[in-house]
Amino acid sequence: MSKREETGLATSAGLIRYMDETFSKIRVKPEHVIGVTVAFVIIEAILTYGRFL
């Protein structure tokens, strides 16, 4: 007998099944995104208003 791959519901035809997608090798923690954003805002504020501080 041949092995059959489970295809899911017939109503989901054409939709992406995210569990079958490959995962990215680049992992970024949410803390790093927040840290880079805060650093960017601080650097931008210093460059913009630095002469007034």
Curated annotation (Swiss-Prot):
| InterPro entries the record matches | Preprot_translocase_SecG, SecG/Sec61-beta/Sbh
List the HAMAP family.
SecG
Membrane protein topology class: Single-pass membrane protein
Has keyword Cytoplasm?
no
Q: Which UniProt keywords apply?
A: Cell membrane, Membrane, Protein transport, Translocation, Transmembrane, Transmembrane helix, Transport
Question: Would you tell me the protein name for this molecule?
Answer: Preprotein translocase subunit SecG
Please state which protein family the record places this protein in. Belongs to the SEC61-beta family.
Q: Which residues lie on this side of the membrane: Extracellular?
A: 50-53
What subcellular locations does the record give? Cell membrane
Per UniProt, subunit arrangement is: Component of the Sec protein translocase complex. Heterotrimer consisting of alpha (SecY), beta (SecG) and gamma (SecE) subunits. The heterotrimers can form oligomers, although 1 heterotrimer is thought to be able to translocate proteins. Interacts with the ribosome. May interact with SecDF, and other proteins may be involved.
Q: Name one GO cellular component term.
A: plasma membrane
Extract one GO BP annotation from the record. protein transport
Which residue ranges run through the membrane? 31-49
- Top-level taxonomy: Archaea, Methanobacteriati, Methanobacteriota, Methanomada group, Methanococci
Residue intervals annotated with topology Cytoplasmic: 1-30
Top-level division of the source organism's lineage: Archaea
Determine if Nuclease is one of this entry's keywords: no
Q: What does this protein do?
A: Subunit of the protein translocation channel SecYEG. The function of the beta subunit is unknown, but it may be involved in stabilization of the trimeric complex.
Which gene name belongs to this protein? secG
